[in-house]
Amino acid sequence: MMNVKVKVYNGVKYDANSTKVAEVEYNNIKGYEVVTGERATEIGLETDENSRDEYNEYLIITLEDGETSTFCNSHVDMFRI
């Protein structure tokens, strides 16, 4: 198990003009993965058009209870704390 902090940006983190708008901490997560390719496309199709990642990459955090939190990876940074 590990603790992580997720910083959320107002746009694509690869753009120097993006700024942090939120910060969330998760304690005792089971794991995480960054999903790209076909699986990321499937995730994008399950969300509304405004929630899709421009770079087709998603961060999935598996919580202690088995639930998951999914983020547009190009809009967040995750740090182990």
Labelled PLM ranges:
Residues M1-M2, R80-I81:
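Short intrinsically disordered terminal tails
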Residues M2-K13:
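A short beta-strand micro-motif
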Residues V8-N10, L63, R80:
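Residue-level signal for short segments within beta-strands and strand-turn junctions
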Residues A16-M78:
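Acidic, low-complexity, intrinsically disordered interaction modules
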